[in-house]
């Protein structure tokens, strides 16, 4: 089974959208195996967004992601990364289809409500930043 990380960003948490977003992912047939709420600090943000460190928007991204609480969740299932990416929609909500999280709930390209792993390999790394293996729960979903 493939695992992937979902972050509900500060704009999503502040607008009370966490439950709706998590529910959308479960409706895809993905099983939530880890969940926590936290205030991301600059050190964790730097590690999480390290691939973007040299991009011009990096500083603004770190400022935004550390501006309020986030919800981190791990989902598991067949093709979990692909299913979640499709359900999230394009990075820019203005270019996202209706029916996707960003198309329905995103504000702008920065406040786009969610982050999701873009590959199974990156998911493993990202999950390890937010969860220890002992915090992930294996159970039979019925």
Curated annotation (Swiss-Prot):
Enzyme Commission code(s) on record: 2.7.4.6
Any coiled-coil regions, as ranges: none
Protein's GO biological process: CTP biosynthetic process; GTP biosynthetic process; UTP biosynthetic process
Keyword Protein biosynthesis: no
Needed co-factor(s): Mg(2+)
PROSITE patterns named among the record's database cross-references: NDPK_LIKE
UniProt keyword Metal-binding, yes or no: yes
Localization, UniProt: Cytoplasm
UniProt xrefs under CDD domains: NDPk_I
Chain intervals for the UniProt region annotation (Disordered): 87-106
Gene Ontology cellular-component annotations: cytoplasm
GO molecular function: ATP binding; metal ion binding; nucleoside diphosphate kinase activity
A UniProt-annotated Pfam family: NDK
Keywords linked to the UniProt accession: ATP-binding, Cytoplasm, Kinase, Magnesium, Metal-binding, Nucleotide metabolism, Nucleotide-binding, Phosphoprotein, Transferase
Residues annotated as catalytic: 115
Catalyzed chemical reaction(s): a 2'-deoxyribonucleoside 5'-diphosphate + ATP = a 2'-deoxyribonucleoside 5'-triphosphate + ADP; a ribonucleoside 5'-diphosphate + ATP = a ribonucleoside 5'-triphosphate + ADP
Binding residue positions for ATP: 9, 57, 85, 91, 102, 112
First-level EC class: transferase
Family: Belongs to the NDK family.
Role this protein plays: Major role in the synthesis of nucleoside triphosphates other than ATP. The ATP gamma phosphate is transferred to the NDP beta phosphate via a ping-pong mechanism, using a phosphorylated active-site intermediate.
Oligomeric and partner information: Homotetramer.
Record-linked NCBIfam families: PRK00668.1
Official protein name in the record: Nucleoside diphosphate kinase
Organism: Dehalococcoides mccartyi (strain ATCC BAA-2266 / KCTC 15142 / 195)
């Amino acid at each position: 089974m493939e695992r992937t990380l979902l972050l509900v960003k500060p704009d999503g948490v502040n607008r009370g959208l966490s439950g709706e977003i998590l529910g959308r992912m479960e409706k895809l047939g993905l099983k939530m195996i880890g969940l926590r709420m936290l205030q991301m600090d600059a050190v964790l943000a730097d590690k999480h967004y390290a691939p973007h460190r040299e991009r011009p928007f990096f500083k603004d991204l770190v400022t935004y992601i550390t501006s309020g609480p986030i919800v981190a969740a791990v989902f598991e299932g067949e093709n979990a990364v692909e299913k979640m990416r499709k359900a999230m929609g394009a990075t820019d909500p203005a270019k996202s289809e209706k029916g996707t999280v960003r198309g329905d709930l995103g504000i702008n390209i920065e406040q786009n409500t969610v982050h999701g792993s873009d590959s199974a390999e990156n998911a493993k790394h990202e999950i390890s930043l937010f969860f220890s293996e002992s915090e992930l729960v294996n159970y039979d979903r019925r």
